[in-house]
Amino acid sequence: IPQVKLGIVAVSRDCFVLSLSERRRRAVVESCAKEGTSLYECKTVVESENDVAKAVAEVKAAGCNALVVFLGNFGPETPEALLVKEFGGPAMIAAAAEETGKDLINGRGDAYCGMLNCSYNLGLRKLKAVIPAYPVGTADGIAGMIADFVPVARAILGLSSLKIITFGPRPYDFLACNAPIAPLFKMGINIQENSELDLFEAYNKHKDDPR
């Protein structure tokens, strides 16, 4: 069973205060700790495409195999989508809700609108990420979303390293004939389908094998 090591990367649109994303990211990490969910807090905040490589390198160096992309404010559309692409593993995206209406200069996140743009950008790029049913929340709410993401990430990691060896009507290495199992290939599963003749041949080759 794959062991999931989560990392969280905050993103910030450069017309917002970067410290807002940092503060909200820390709050999410603290809430996760209270819930018993361990995750690595990436110190790089992604504002531009130049930050993406740095953030991915940081979480990879920490051994993370699953990622939470956290919109601490509106978020930069292209860099956050590239973050999902370049990381290459299971990724969840969630966004911060505004804590109060009393600080609309330095405390305005506008993350709900950013979440809409992010999901559309992912669709245009044909990238896959887990988006919770209600992806905008407080630190405690997002900690709950992250806890729910862990078993999903575990399943994705397990399937991505799965190899299925089957015996059916199609001979080995006839990928063009395997349209019915195409959805499995799309999930990253490696499939080797052998024909009944392949099975018969293998059986004969191992005749009298003491194993």
Language model feature labels by segment:
Residues 1-211:
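An N-terminal assembly and electron-transfer interface module characteristic of large anaerobic redox
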